[in-house]
């Protein structure tokens, strides 16, 4: 997303827990969104943000903890840019919206076909709580929103166990090592 926005002439401000150098980012902010006070201090550098793309989550031991931590991260981001002239916010979640949380995978029957208008599944699901915070902030501050629920993300973050590119690379390496076709 950052690459494309930059190509289209946008000023891109990136955010992550660590201080990284991203070639497509005009400015990078290192902030731990699980810490409200630290987030607010760090996000003062994004007081001019007009569009937000929220694409992060933090895996916790239980879904109840996922709900608490991940909804707080969305809230802390928006509270940290409370004075920014935000026009639109895009939240990226995923397939667990339709299939249930990790704790409930294969325990509840999903509604099929998957439709954006389908009711939420029973049980805790941090995606739902992230959406609720987004909806609350959008209504209070007057910006538009969108939610994107891709099945698979292919990225480049080292150490991300949910990175499909890493999964395919490991599988290809095993196939090569064992002499099996890929």
Please give the residue ranges for each predicted region:
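Conserved sequence/active-site signature of Rossmann-fold short-chain dehydrogenase/reductase
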Residues: 34, 97, 153-155
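NAD(P)H-binding glycine-rich loop region in Rossmannoid oxidoreductase-like domains
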Residues: 20-80
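A conserved pocket-lining segment of Rossmann-fold NAD(P)-dependent short-chain dehydrogenase/reductase
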Residues: 170-182
């Amino acid at each position: 997303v950052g690459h494309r926005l930059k190509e289209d002439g946008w000023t891109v401000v990136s955010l992550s827990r660590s201080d990284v150098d991203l070639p497509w980012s005009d400015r990078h902010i290192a902030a731990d969104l699980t810490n409200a006070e630290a987030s607010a201090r760090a996000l003062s550098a994004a007081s001019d943000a007009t569009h937000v793309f929220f694409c992060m989550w933090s895996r916790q031991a239980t879904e109840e903890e996922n709900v608490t931590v991940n909804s707080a991260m969305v809230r802390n981001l928006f509270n940290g840019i409370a004075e920014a002239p935000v026009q639109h916010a895009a939240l990226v979640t995923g397939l667990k919206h339709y299939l249930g949380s990790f704790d409930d995978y294969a325990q509840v029957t999903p509604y099929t076909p998957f439709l954006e208008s389908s009711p939420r599944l029973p049980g805790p699901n941090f995606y739902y709580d992230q959406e609720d915070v987004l909806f609350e902030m959008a209504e209070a501050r007057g910006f538009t929103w969108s939610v994107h629920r891709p099945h698979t993300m292919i990225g480049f973050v080292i150490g991300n166990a949910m990175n499909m590119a890493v999964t395919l690379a490991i599988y290809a390496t095993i196939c090569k090592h064992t002499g099996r076709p890929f």
